[in-house]
């Protein structure tokens, strides 16, 4: 499966390369450098790796995705990239490098990872999509409704439960279903409740 994931990632990198170039040019013209956002995340067996995204935040906020949504500054271009999930497409390279899979738990920053709660990482590689990615597709909007000191902490508890559910129910068929739901949420969001 790992070889197949890498091969599919390479295929899509080649197919999408013109779009990558277009996004890079638009990002340079609209936001300037840096084009990519890079951050340490925790992978399988608690190994750290750099996750890649197209930058959507202001330079001031660029190193911290988990501050309160009302003080995050996202440009109109950045919001477009987020809403269409185009900001996530550089993670195809993470899959190609073997850090991630297409389906699995979303990789967290080290500060949020407590080993005993994330024991599924002994078995699973992080994924580009999965149960928590689909349910929390509009994560910033959900966080803005939570009034406690660390709104992401509430979301993280649910994500961990979803990741453990995936751990005990994973199969090739489940992965195919999650890929299909992910594509539906991108191209027909009203069907999956994402607006």
Question: Model regions: which residues?
Answer:
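A hydrophobic, helix-centered structural microdomain
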Residues: 1-59, 169-195
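Positions in alpha-helical segments
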Residues: 9, 37, 75-79, 162
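Short, hydrophobic secondary-structure boundary micro-motifs
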Residues: 23, 38, 66, 103-105, ...
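Short beta-strand segments
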Residues: 23-24, 38-40, 53, 93-97, ...
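Short, glycine-rich, amphipathic interfacial segments at transmembrane boundaries or analogous
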Residues: 37-73, 132-158
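A short, structured surface patch at a secondary-structure boundary
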Residues: 70-131, 179
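C-terminal terminal-structure detector
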Residues: 125-195
